[in-house]
Amino acid sequence: MLEFNATLLAQIVDFIILLIFLRLVAYKPLMKLLSERSEHIERNIAAAEKERQQAEQLRASYEAEMRRAREQAQEIIQKATKAGEEQALQIIENAKNETVRMKETALAEIEREKQKAMAELRDQVVTLSILVAGKIINRSMSSEIQHEIVRDFIKEAGELPC
């Protein structure tokens, strides 16, 4: 069986004293240190979570701001495009109006030149008619008959399409 001797008993007593001493000196401070370390880690995790939430809120805020900025930019582009199209239509309308005005001016100028040419032509025809008639008649007709013949000729010449 087991023998109890004094050294075994002394070793058991020494072991118990060592356990009490280690509990007082090492175990409690070690547990306190581990507890503090655990609390510190939990605080860091909570702080990191809080910062992550703040970062998420900032990201959402920035995304909303970017969306608003894109919408405003799109609106500005649409307004500028519409203004450009309206300006182009106005320029085209002005060009059409100017073309019509220039055409009317040109037609009026052509008509004036035509009337002027007709008047000059009539004057030349009258002069030539008088000369031709004078030579044909050889001064045998009276000037009254000559004028009547010329008037008839001018009247007939005025009815000609020129």
From Swiss-Prot:
Predominant location category: membrane
Residue spans crossing the bilayer: 2-22
A Gene Ontology term for the protein's cellular component: proton-transporting ATP synthase complex
Keyword Transmembrane: yes
Keywords of the record: ATP synthesis, Cell membrane, CF(0), Hydrogen ion transport, Ion transport, Membrane, Transmembrane, Transmembrane helix, Transport
Function: F(1)F(0) ATP synthase produces ATP from ADP in the presence of a proton or sodium gradient. F-type ATPases consist of two structural domains, F(1) containing the extramembraneous catalytic core and F(0) containing the membrane proton channel, linked together by a central stalk and a peripheral stalk. During catalysis, ATP synthesis in the catalytic domain of F(1) is coupled via a rotary mechanism of the central stalk subunits to proton translocation.
The protein's name in its UniProt record: ATP synthase subunit b
Organism: Pelotomaculum thermopropionicum (strain DSM 13744 / JCM 10971 / SI)
